[in-house]
């Protein structure tokens, strides 16, 4: 052997010994380093986690280090039901048939190239587990909503095994009441199935063809009518001939000043009344945005709304007044509300688009159509039945020049499959069957929402509306009892369910007032209790904004006032007299 080869052999052997030494000795040294290196961990990254659709407020903040997220072991156990066992310097975390075993702070048989992922951290005496380790147990962890908000989502293996449209539905609070009066033509059980086809040239704008293709007679169709135009009697008769009743989207597009108690308004109302069938009148909708000619004038809007309501009440008692907003912005919605006595139904228009405002950087494929409904539903369904005045889903967009058929199938399936069960106060839904690439005004030719052009999308719609819960004709003689529901605006903390104080006030009919410190006083049937308030910021349904849920401990309140309740299949059911 040459001298040079001998030297290389010795050096190589030395390196091997050093590496072997690291394997045997280094973990203890790294363990010591981890204990002393907590200043490198950023704690307080987020105070919230979403797990399988439910919000959880953590007992301890989430940490972040080297692009990994760390969750405390007590919190991990609370929200995922993992089990732990400790013996000497060994810690085992298990879930179902998978387990992690830590020896002196490191997972056994872990690659040395991933030291930061293999070890856990200790902060203030608590063990913090990195997300990569939790994912070894089968969970999926990520920033909620494309990393643009500070909420972490944890999805269980069972949840991941479901189809996308069936994932993360979360829990629902149901409130069952007796002796609830119904609004005009309100179905107590079921949803009127509706659509808009007047711009679908693919089916020659035919309601009968739409009914045939979808395999279901639709109970209602709608038409846009500009204020100043006569009532569309001929079209309304076509709707009736197709087995439905009309919704008229009546829009004062020259501004609110033209709305007066004059001959035009009276004749419009008389023509509507002469039809002698239910008519859903969606007057001046989407006023909460900035894109209508009647936005930004809430006082005048309410004044004109009341005027139209009073004329309709006198001349056309068959007319249902639909006060209809757009999903967002939320902050301006309530200032336009005319009052319960002037509104029959509250509506909202919902669109699942792949990108917002034709901006490639504003990707919005994560948005859940059910969550887009939640704000209006939770705010108003305790006092008015709800209408989804328009619902559309992108299947092609010019923003990226791509077809998104799977996206459309997923969102349509999620909306129509779960709406009757989870949102019993929704009484109408209308699909917006339009290819806006052809039919929209210039500047808005962005998305194709039509469902008749592609078989997979049409089949998804047809499969989910075929149930008896979607109604094809007017229901009469509504039942006296009604089921209300409440979703999304609650969270779990320390094993307790906290619902927003507005739920306690509006849905349980309890008096809620700010009390001393961080507590609220709840009064019901002459009895009052003080309860601690816990707040949690959660993601809004769109645009990466936050909202604060001011939660009250629901179990404590129900027990204190002896309100009948039970947990069924993970949902809370409450029985309460109206």
Over which residues does each language-model region extend?
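An active-site-proximal structural segment forming one wall of the substrate-binding cleft
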Residues: 258-280, 301-315, 319, 335, ...
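Aromatic- and acid-rich polysaccharide-binding/catalytic face
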Residues: 334-364, 387-393, 432-434
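Substrate-binding cleft of secreted/luminal carbohydrate-active enzymes
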Residues: 189-194, 278-280, 285, 387-389, ...
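Active-site groove signature of glycoside hydrolases
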Residues: 268-298, 319-328
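Hydrophobic faces of well-ordered beta-strands that scaffold small-molecule active sites
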Residues: 193-195, 219-223, 246-249, 279-283, ...
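N-terminal carbohydrate-binding/catalytic regions of secreted carbohydrate-active enzymes
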Residues: 193-271, 411, 418, 423, ...
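Primary recognition of N-terminal secretory signal peptides and signal-anchoring hydrophobic helices
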Residues: 2-173, 473-578
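Glycoside hydrolase catalytic-domain groove-lining segments
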Residues: 234-249, 355-397, 452-459
